[in-house]
Structures are given as structure tokens and as C-alpha cells.
């Protein structure tokens, strides 16, 4: 052990398992292992738990900076929320929604389908039906194994939509649900197969486009409280904050992962602790794997695969007002506009709060452009966009905040990782393959619940089950 490798780790401890990352996946893995009688150390680089779920008070307003919504199919998360004694509440959705058409005209409507014109609606329904068919045929568990996987993974979602419809408004509107709303990448940057996985993880594409389904409920006190409650149960002798992991080493010089013998000691070096264990669960997104030195190095396939997984980019905008003024106008606060700066807006008022909160989203290339502007200009343009949906009152919030996970050292994007064109069918089957004593767990690798807290919890539980020797869970449980 050299001075360089220890990196200032002055305290050495022994545990059965080290978990890297104290987000929902890592904490669920730790919780499952501790319940089975294993000793665990959870090492978290940040000064908080929760990963990409994060709540904080800004100028007196409680804001959910990260992930926040629960849909009815997210049974793993719903069961845990109940078990932890937490409560949920429905997103406000009474009144009319607003659709901003490509020509800039404003339309109010009720129901789930935009008032985009009869012919465009017909085309949108056709595209949704085609995607629902692919979802039913391919599923979320092993999309790369489908006979048409290569074909569907080597054409962009943008071009596939336009192969099946010549209605540009229909293509743009359907594209927004996956591109802007989920993967936060331009529709030309990911494949149809990746879009199908995203939809299959929610049960169907119809579910994905139904905001009353996919954005159904929130946790009272914020989604981060799920992780905070799990961490509090585990205790400070299990969860270590401000502890970025630098090196994971299990063999002497010349060792290979192919030679790994279960139970071989693993040493994990961090800035604060050196931990000796038998197994490791890496519970951070794939774009951060390269922040860790692995000794021996990861296999070639892993090195290549991780370079084809990246996070998107989105600005989550929070605007707080003295009252939810849009409700007085008979509006729900929900708005969509594929060509608008903020492509979506929702009523995000907190439980029991007399003030009103709007949340809007500016994704991918639009976010790039805005981040090149001074903060005040960015704020002006975003609020102007919100006003197009809900009126001039939106220009004057009492609190304004932009979530920017792209600049976070230990996140570097939002919402989650996806493959570039051709990557999913090429590498998907290998993304959870254990490497020696190391297992992987995060929402980015999930089937059901992909990119969501529910998927993170499923992955954490699955990794723990593998460590415990329980074998793989069934595809339906993943």
C-alpha cells in the first residue's frame, strides 16, 4: 500500500460489504444486507444522502431539486414509502391544461391529448399505437435480445417517427415525451430501442404520455426523505458522508477478474476511510465509474461500454408565487409546447403550502443555449416562457431557482444515463454483469422503473440478493 493509494485514508475498518453511493439504490442494497445480518459501510462522496433526489429550502421556499414523482406502477417505491411511515399526496391537476402550438397560438384543453388539430391528433394516436405495440412485443427486461434490436437501435427516434408520419407537429409532440421529458437528449441522439425501453419501463408508451399517470404523486417532505429515513435507520456507523471512493482493489499485481475467488478480500480506499470487505456494490451512475480506479483494471468490455453511456441535460426551473394564481383562472398549471423554451410546466405546489409553485423544464440543446447566457437573462427568458402558458403573473415569482445537476461534481447530468445510437443492443446484456467481487446498482441499469427511484430501489435489492447468494430475481422483479 503506497502513500499515493491511501489518499489520506487514516481510518481503517472491516465490513462484509462496501456500498459506493448513498442514493436510493445504495441505501436499499445496504438496508437489505443489514437485514440479512451482514455488516456494511456505505461511502458517499457528497455531504448528503439521496443521490439525484434532493430537497432544500431556498429563500424560505421548500423545493425538490431532484427527482420527485411517483406513478401507480412504482410498487417497490410505494411499498417502501409505506414501510418507512411516509405519506404521499397527489399533484394538483384540476382545471384546464394549456397547449402552445408550433405557430405560437395558445389553446386550453382537458384530457390527455393535445388540441393539435384533427389530422395531427390522428397521427399522434397512430404513433402512440405503434410504440405501444413495440413495447408489448419487446418489453423492458431484455430489449437487446429481440430479433429486431439491432435495426431499432441503429435508427434515431427522430428519424423513426418521421418514417411513420409526415405530420411534423405529431412527430415533435410525441418526441417531446421521451427526448425532452425523459432522456433529456435530442431525439436524434438516441435510438428507437432506447425509447421503447423508456416506455416499457413505465408499462406502455400510453402511460408515458399520460401526465396524470407518470406524475401522479409526491412524498410529503420530499423524495429525498426516503433516502434520509433509510440512512437514519442504518446509522452513522454505516453511512459515511464526504467520503469519495478513489480505488477498489481486490488482488495483487497481475491478478485478473477471471481469477476471482468469492471471499477474496477487497480493499476500498476513500479520502476518509480504508475499508476491507468481501464484496462491493457500486451504486452510482455509469458516467461516474471512471472516477474510481479499479485494480486490476475493469475488463475491456466494461471500459468500452461505459463510454457509450451518458447523462442528458435539463434545467429544472422552480418559480414560487404568493398564491397559485393559475387556479383562479381555472387552469391546472399543466402546459406543453414542443417548440417552447420550457417544453413542460406543472403545478408543483407543496403539500399544505398556501403559496403556489410552478416547475418547468428546459432540456438538451435549449439548456446548452441558456447556460451560455448571463443568469438574469436566462431567468427572464424562462419566466417569459412560463408566462406564455399561464399569463403575465408568471413573470413575477417571489422565489426563483434553477436545478443544475450538470454542474454537480458527483452527478454531471440529469436525469439518468442512456446509450448512444447502437449502444443498447451492443452492451445492454452486459451492463449488470458482476466483475469479480463488484456488482452494479442504479436506476440507469433498471428495467422496470428505469431512470426512476423505483428502479433504483429494485436494482439495490437485486444487487444485495446477488451478494447474499440468492441468485438473480425474476425479470418481473427487476
Curated annotation (Swiss-Prot):
Organism, scientific name: Kocuria rosea
Gene: puo
Any Pfam family matching the protein: Amino_oxidase
EC number(s) on file: 1.4.3.10
Highest taxon listed in the record's lineage: Bacteria
Family per record: Belongs to the flavin monoamine oxidase family.
Name of this protein: Putrescine oxidase
Keyword annotations: FAD, Flavoprotein, Oxidoreductase
Reactions catalysed according to its record: putrescine + O2 + H2O = 4-aminobutanal + H2O2 + NH4(+)
InterPro entries attached to this UniProt entry: Amino_oxidase, FAD/NAD-bd_sf, Flavin_amine_oxidase, Flavin_MAO
Stored Gene3D superfamilies: FAD/NAD(P)-binding domain
Residues reported to bind FAD: 15-70
Cofactor: FAD
Entry annotated with the keyword Lipid biosynthesis: no
Any one GO MF annotation of this record: putrescine oxidase activity
PANTHER family in the cross-refs: AMINE OXIDASE, AMINE OXIDASE [FLAVIN-CONTAINING] B
